[in-house]
A protein has these predicted regions:
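RNA pseudouridine synthases
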Residues: 1-406
Length: 406
């Protein structure tokens, strides 16, 4: 059973007739039970329709009882020996009453199926929030060949979803005002949170049970776009120009934060002047622009001894021309990057020496920040082998002692 309340009935009617999907209806009803969103959308839609339909039947029965009548009593009140009246009643039941019932059901149950594309989430909580998409995400993660114990699932949504959600909210708000009910917009469940509630378990299952947590060194980011409705935000540049400032480093001034800020500033009247409520139905769903995997940096530390008098600590390039063939940094980095399968690195050391100065004694401490490593753990044996690779390859130049990261 869905955790719905009496005050949710008009919201459900309003949103279903406006083209919202079942999960978005739950969001606007402020349902925070995660299990409710994990149900198949068709089952949820069926329960929503049943909830509203049963409520209306209950109201009808209460009205009849208040008038001191029952369906059987109303039927018995009709004179038995009056065929014309009976015929009229049968005709009314067979035609007019049936039509009224169909119209009433149509208002609450606009479609047997969910809308092809939800007017609020643009399909993010429909086909893109299910087993098929979970398989797609998992396949991308497996293809990248990362090693990880846990993962964090993040979502990037198009900014126009904020505009559409606000439009649906105003649509519901009007209904609530007429019925003297109060609902706070801050209590609405966000699309991003709903997506995570549904997909975290599904993705984890596809990856063999790897825990999907709220904090992890390994992140899987899913980015959605919807070019068809990009223009939904454009009116805000006029309605609240101060919120949108040109930035060369950004592809668009209509960032999610800027749109949210603008919606908070403008009045309902200004919004409704430029944008319809409820929003217009789209013809296409959101598409997955990118599924990106990223592991936070890890650090490898150690000490090095340098015996060569012609080896700089870092690459020596002057006016675009390389002066030395190699450097301490490069000699250490090459095998380390290969072992950890990292995309890049940052090298730092405790001080530095001139090219013609040797580093003796216990060696100079150094650290390497490995960017987006696909491997994060090496055994002590593997670390020893890595040390030997550097030593054997460059025995005339450098000795390296690498500490295993704790």
């Amino acid at each position: 059973m869905l955790p719905l309340k009496e005050k949710d009935k008009p919201i459900i009617r309003k949103l279903l007739s406006s083209g919202c999907c079942a999960r978005c209806v739950l969001r606007f009803c402020c349902v925070t039970l995660q299990a409710a969103y994990r149900k198949p959308p068709q089952d949820t839609l069926r329960e929503l329709r049943a909830f509203v339909h049963d409520a209306e039947n209950g109201e009808t029965r209460e009205s009849a009882e208040g008038n001191g009548e029952t369906p059987d009593a109303a039927a018995a009140a009709e004179p038995a020996g009056d065929p014309p009246s009976k015929r009229a009643k049968l005709e009314r039941v067979g035609t007019g009453a049936a039509e009224e019932e169909e119209e009433e059901d149509a208002a609450v149950e606009p479609k047997e199926e969910e809308p092809s594309v939800c007017v609020s989430c643009l399909g993010v909580l429909q086909e893109l929030c299910g087993p098929t998409h979970a398989v797609k995400i998992a396949e991308r993660v497996k293809a990248e060949k990362y090693e990880f114990d846990t993962l964090l699932l993040s979502v990037s949504l198009p900014a126009q979803l904020c505009v559409r959600e606000h439009s649906c909210w105003l649509h519901v708000k009007k209904e609530m005002r007429e019925k003297s009910l109060a609902v706070d917009k801050d209590d609405l469940v966000q699309v991003k949170e709903t997506f995570k509630w549904v997909m975290q378990g599904a993705v984890a299952q596809e990856l063999g049970g790897v825990p999907v947590v709220i904090r992890s060194l390994f992140e899987v980011g899913v980015e959605f776009t919807h070019p068809e409705t990009d223009a939904d935000c454009h009116f805000l540049a006029t309605a609240c120009a101060s919120c949108f400032k040109s930035n060369r480093n950004k592809r668009s001034v209509f960032t999610r934060m800027a749109v949210v800020k603008a919606l908070e500033k403008i009045s309902d009247a200004v919004f409704l002047k430029h944008y319809s409520s409820p929003p217009a139905a789209p013809t296409s769903s959101c598409s997955t622009e990118n599924i990106q995997c990223l592991h936070l940096a890890i650090f490898v530390a150690g000490r090095y001894n340098k015996f060569s008098r012609s080896l700089p600590q870092t690459p020596w390039v002057i006016d675009g021309e390389r002066r030395m063939e190699s450097s301490v940094e490069e000699l250490i980095a090459a095998p380390v990057l290969s072992s950890f399968r990292a995309d890049g690195f940052n090298f730092s050391s405790s001080g530095r020496e001139d090219v013609d100065v040797r580093t003796l004694g216990n060696g100079r401490p150094f650290a390497m920040e490995l960017l987006d490593p696909h491997r994060t753990k090496l055994s002590h044996v593997e670390m020893k082998q890595l040390q030997e690779v550097v030593f054997i390859t460059h025995s005339q130049s450098i000795i390296i002692i690498i500490s295993f990261p704790s």
